[in-house]
């Protein structure tokens, strides 16, 4: 029989200590993803009794008590986060994404991104909320508006970071209007930040699987769901060496016996050393792909190249099997040329993979997830693709027709041209509409070479970019040893990836903030763009970037300048004019206000643009130190530096939520899941503390 718990006022244990222990117990449950009933376990209760029997009698340990304490803590700590948002130095930027949970709920994750009063970049989970109804833009917008109002940030929402779905474009059109009726369509488009990670994902998938990558992956998943093993093998085999390797890896991992056989052949002692690739989502459960499979494909290729000898030995060892089902199909065996193609693919994908890893962070120091890295990174990758494009430029249309992998997008005439190997692709919005699809016209406009300017990067970032895995194609390529059809396959893949990258590079021009993030970086400034965009047609891009930042600055930060300067003017007028007539005072103020409007805001920007590059490793700190010189511009700059490059926080939170919703906890409600995940995020990232009391 469980002893009756004493009333709190009868206990010798301080109330503050009891409350702290309750908070710590909830913190343990939340952070460790254990059941709410964990403290009801007989062995755990016996263990606690050994240390403090009085404590065991005093604290409510039941699962229902933990659930009530979770609700109380969530409400209390949410007020702490609200205060942090109110005190932020910047506007509150949002990122959001959707997820299907293991218990089949549609869940929306919403994060707030800002710079706190300590000048630190912060990210806080605001909601992990069930999304009812269709995923239309209007429906998503209603959820976002409700969340913003719940958190009392409706009037301070800045930009929104999300993936590139058209529904998200419509969502923002519906979302901003209720929050700010003065918003125009162009204003909304300027605040629509495309997730860099999603762009990189689309580029890599286009390179690997062609222009219809999503359909290819979906067909593979349907084959697996229906148990159509042979059809799936043929489906992947049609993708050439990558598909063949996929089938080999799947064969090895299809049974423990085959995995052990491979391990013996590889003579590895540690499992991590012989594992070829991470399990993909589709291989673990029947759900739609989360669009990150290209990373596992890259890692599969990278590991296979290192284990090439072992793989070939494994295939050779199976050739003596009488049962054909126990052998790898002859059509899937990789030739020497196939292995060389995989080497080329690995070299081309590596910089994309490293860019993804670099920019999915939380803005450490001067990089790793800041907005300025998006445009810089895309310039870097465009040069990378153009280097390989030029190196494979001798592949003719006739050679391309020999390629056996015809499901990829054909190479166009403009892409095959080699007269301008280093030319930067022109933004589609710069061409007359009648030339949008004329690749030959586009190629003829590229008369000047434009190269990624590494010398103007900050020294601490320059080393990382120079060593990020991008080597000249001529130094690492095995092109000359490949037959024509394999060269054509790689050439087509390069074209597919380059086109997708060029498509989203052009879309960056829809918002002035991508270029503004570089211009407002004291280490870069406008000079970086001028040194990078040097071709004749690119000079207009520099002018656009400069005009865009001026227009955005004038529209959204003039009110703040006027408030500061008019307050100073009014105070001065009162001191010097005394009781003079009001009409005269108003006349003076109107003339002064007009002068401020003619110079005012843009004078700050003009003064900043005239500065030499600044030797600083922390742009946020630099702007904080120069607030008095640039009161309005510093506010703009801090707002820009608070914008993340990716919406990767949402993906991370989905992964954490999946650890909470184990097969034994699928009955957990969406509201409880939200409380658990929000508290976990706030505690882990320093937003709140649990278990504080005077005696601790």
Predicted regions: what they are:
Residues 32, 36, 40, 45-246, ...:
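Active-site neighborhood segments
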Residues 99, 237, 251-254, 262, ...:
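Extended serine/threonine- and charged-residue-rich low-complexity intrinsically disordered regions
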Residues 550-567, 571, 609, 661-696:
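Polyampholytic, low-complexity intrinsically disordered segments
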Residues 170-174, 191-337:
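Metal-ion-coordinating, acidic/His-rich active-site neighborhoods
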């Amino acid at each position: 029989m469980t002893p009756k718990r004493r009333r709190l006022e009868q206990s010798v244990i301080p109330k503050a200590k009891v409350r702290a222990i309750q908070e710590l117990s909830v913190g343990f449950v939340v952070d460790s993803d254990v059941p709410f009933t964990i403290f009801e376990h007989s062995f755990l209760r016996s263990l606690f009794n050994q240390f403090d029997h009085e404590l065991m009698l005093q604290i409510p340990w039941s699962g229902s008590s933990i659930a009530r304490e979770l609700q109380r803590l969530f409400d209390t700590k949410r007020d702490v986060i609200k205060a942090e948002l109110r005190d932020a130095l910047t506007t509150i930027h949002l990122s959001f994404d959707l997820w299907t949970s293991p218990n089949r709920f549609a869940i929306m994750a919403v994060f707030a991104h800002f710079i706190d009063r300590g000048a630190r970049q912060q990210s806080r989970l605001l909601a992990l909320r069930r999304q009812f109804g269709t995923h239309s833009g209007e429906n998503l917008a209603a959820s976002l508006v409700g969340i913003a109002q719940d958190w009392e940030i409706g009037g301070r929402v800045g930009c929104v970071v999300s993936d590139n779905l058209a529904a998200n474009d419509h969502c923002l059109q519906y979302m901003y209007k209720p929050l700010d009726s003065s918003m125009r369509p162009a204003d909304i488009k300027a605040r629509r930040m495309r997730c860099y990670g999603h762009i990189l994902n689309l580029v890599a998938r286009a390179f690997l699987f062609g222009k219809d990558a999503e359909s290819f992956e979906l067909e593979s998943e349907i084959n697996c769901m229906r148990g159509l093993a042979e059809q799936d093998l043929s489906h992947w085999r049609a993708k050439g060496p990558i598909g063949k390797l996929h089938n080999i890896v799947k064969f090895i991992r299809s049974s423990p016996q085959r995995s052990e056989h491979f391990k013996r052949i590889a003579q590895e002692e540690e499992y991590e050393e012989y594992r070829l690739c991470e399990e993909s989502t589709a291989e673990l459960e029947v759900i739609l792909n989360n669009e990150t499979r290209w990373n596992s494909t890259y890692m599969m290729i990278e590991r296979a190249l290192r284990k090439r000898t072992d793989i070939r030995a494994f295939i050779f060892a199976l050739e003596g099997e009488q049962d054909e089902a126990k052998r790898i199909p002859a059509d899937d065996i990789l030739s020497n040329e196939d292995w060389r193609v995989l080497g080329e693919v690995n070299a081309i994908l590596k910089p994309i993979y490293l860019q993804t890893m670099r920019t999915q962070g939380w803005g450490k120091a001067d990089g790793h997830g800041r907005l300025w890295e998006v445009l810089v990174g895309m310039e870097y990758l465009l040069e990378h693709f153009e280097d390989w494009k030029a190196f494979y430029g001798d592949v003719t249309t006739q050679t391309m027709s020999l390629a056996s992998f015809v499901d990829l997008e054909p190479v166009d005439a403009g892409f095959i041209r080699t007269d301008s190997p280093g030319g930067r692709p022109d933004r589609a919005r710069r061409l007359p509409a009648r030339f949008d699809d004329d690749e030959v016209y586009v190629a003829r406009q590229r008369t000047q070479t434009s190269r990624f300017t590494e010398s103007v990067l900050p020294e601490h970032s320059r080393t990382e970019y120079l060593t990020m895995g991008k080597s000249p194609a001529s130094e690492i390529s095995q092109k000359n040893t490949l037959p024509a059809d394999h060269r054509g396959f790689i050439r087509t893949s390069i074209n597919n990836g380059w086109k997708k990258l060029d498509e989203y590079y052009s879309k960056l021009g829809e918002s002035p903030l991508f270029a503004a993030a570089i211009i407002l970086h004291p280490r870069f400034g406008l000079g970086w763009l001028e040194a990078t965009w040097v071709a004749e047609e690119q000079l207009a891009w520099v002018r656009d970037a400069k005009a865009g930042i001026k227009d955005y600055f004038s529209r959204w930060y003039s009110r703040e300048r006027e408030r500061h300067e008019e307050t100073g003017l009014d105070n001065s007028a009162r001191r010097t004019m005394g009781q003079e007539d009001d009409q005269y005072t108003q006349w003076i103020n109107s003339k002064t206000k007009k002068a401020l409007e003619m110079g005012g805001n843009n004078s700050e920007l003009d003064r900043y643009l005239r500065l030499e590059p600044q030797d600083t490793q922390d742009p946020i700190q630099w702007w904080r130190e120069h607030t008095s010189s640039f009161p309005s511009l510093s506010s703009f700059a801090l707002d820009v530096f608070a914008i993340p490059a990716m919406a990767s926080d949402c993906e991370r939170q989905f992964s954490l939520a999946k650890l909470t919703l184990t097969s034994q906890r699928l009955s957990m409600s969406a509201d409880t899941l939200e409380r658990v995940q929000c508290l976990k995020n706030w505690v882990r990232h320093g937003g709140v503390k649990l278990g504080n009391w005077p005696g601790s």
